[in-house]
């Protein structure tokens, strides 16, 4: 894993690869986040992963994700004077985006590094995509609907909401990790 410090602005043409921040929240599908990192690498992205504290508590294989990204997962703020472990992003993805994170993000409640990273992304001028994983009952809550509308108004690109519920034939759909890349790579 690299502890290198890279100071550059988003979209810096002097860099060979693009850098993607991946924010992972605590939902059952988080176990598949390695698919996103692998797909990002195939498309020429380097990745840095931020996780909510709850997501770190068994929702995905942290050792595998660190091995895939080549960098430590971040979930806590660095101390003053510590180097930045990731360069600034060229794009930011939150997948899966949970009810709690979407609502905190829209309200600017940066109580975790993961949510603070999303809040800051609005001011960076880079593409931001969200792949929500929210149950129907929670999605019906007015706060969630308002939060999605507010974030869309800020330019966040949302994929269709994933519920994980089986279809009429009893088949559970797959979480489409690559959709996050499609969203941030749109012109």
Where on the chain are the PLM-derived regions?
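A cross-family phosphate/adenosyl-ligand binding-site feature
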Residues: 1-187
